Amino acid sequence: MNFKDEKTGRIRSHNYNLDYIFQEGITWTALSSGNFGARYSKQGKLADSKGSMLYLHNTKNTNYALAFLNSAVSSHILKVTSQTLDFKPGRISELPMKIEDNFFEMITSLSRDAVTISKNDWDSFEVSWDFERHSLLNGPTMQSS
């Protein structure tokens, strides 16, 4: 069988980004009726067509980029440029992120803290892969819980 596209010569149904799979990145829901929201994605995850993934060449910028993508500035730009319910990777890649050296450490630290708080909150629910026990049972004794 020939799995190549007759027009382009590329093999169909093939992952062209093998260098990036399972790498740390930023993901977002591509289809949303609400505001754009980006999430940190740790190593070991795959992207999909409605859960796109942004990979940074320099991973030390990941939390800075995550903070920018979740900012009011990005939200306003995306409301103008993505007037449908679909947040496509091309639109996200066109956002004008500028790294400000004077604020880099502070923004990165705040973003990292927000990711930790969100993860801890998510992990308190049974649907999380990292769920251990309900937060109501976190007291030192069952009686204090």
Positions of predicted regions on the chain:
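S-adenosyl-L-methionine
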Residues: M1-S145
